[in-house]
Amino acid sequence: MSLAHINIFLAFTVSLVGLLMYRSHLMSSLLCLEGMMLSLFVMATMVVLNTHFTLASMMPIILLVFAACERALGLSLLVMVSNTYGVDHVQNLNLLQC
C-alpha cells in the first residue's frame, strides 16, 4: 500500500471520527460527510487509474453525482432548519415531522 493510499484512508477515517464526534450540529455533520465523499472519490479514481480497468472509469463520476445530490439535499435541509429554528442542531430535525 502506497503512501497516497494511506493518506486517503487516513482522511476518510478522520472524517468518520469527526462525523461521530460532532454530530450535534448539522453543518459539522455535512462537512464531515463531504470529506468522506471526497476521500472516496480520490480513492476510486486512484484505483481506476492504477488497475487500468476501463469499465469502471465511470464509477468516480457517478460517485460525484451522488455526492452533489447529497450536498444539495443537506444544504436545503440546513437552510430549512436554520430558518425555522434559528440554530442548526440535529435534534431539531425530529421537530420537522408532520
From Swiss-Prot:
Signal peptide, first to last residue: none
Coiled coil: none
Swiss-Prot/TrEMBL keywords: Electron transport, Membrane, Mitochondrion, Mitochondrion inner membrane, NAD, Respiratory chain, Translocase, Transmembrane, Transmembrane helix, Transport, Ubiquinone
Keyword Metal-binding recorded: no
One annotated GO molecular function: NADH dehydrogenase (ubiquinone) activity
Function recorded in the entry: Core subunit of the mitochondrial membrane respiratory chain NADH dehydrogenase (Complex I) which catalyzes electron transfer from NADH through the respiratory chain, using ubiquinone as an electron acceptor. Part of the enzyme membrane arm which is embedded in the lipid bilayer and involved in proton translocation.
Subunit structure: Core subunit of respiratory chain NADH dehydrogenase (Complex I) which is composed of 45 different subunits.
Protein name: NADH-ubiquinone oxidoreductase chain 4L
Gene this chain is encoded by: MT-ND4L
